[in-house]
Amino acid sequence: MEFSPRAAELTTLLESRISNFYTNI
């Protein structure tokens, strides 16, 4: 299974959204 740069980018974006969500609580 290849891990595409796009998938890595989406994962990073998702993680940053999640961390922002938790810091805003």
Swiss-Prot record:
Assigned GO CC terms: mitochondrial inner membrane; proton-transporting ATP synthase complex
Task: Tell me which UniProt keywords the record has, alphabetically.
Answer: ATP synthesis, ATP-binding, CF(1), Hydrogen ion transport, Ion transport, Membrane, Mitochondrion, Mitochondrion inner membrane, Nucleotide-binding, Transport
Query: Where on the tree of life does the source sit, at the highest rank?
Result: Eukaryota
**Cellular location of this protein?**
Mitochondrion; Mitochondrion inner membrane
Q: Which residues cross the membrane?
A: none
Please give the family membership noted in the entry. Belongs to the ATPase alpha/beta chains family.
Quaternary assembly: F-type ATPases have 2 components, CF(1) - the catalytic core - and CF(0) - the membrane proton channel. CF(1) has five subunits: alpha(3), beta(3), gamma(1), delta(1), epsilon(1). CF(0) has three main subunits: a, b and c.
The name on file for this protein is ATP synthase subunit alpha, mitochondrial
- Gene name tied to this protein: ATPA
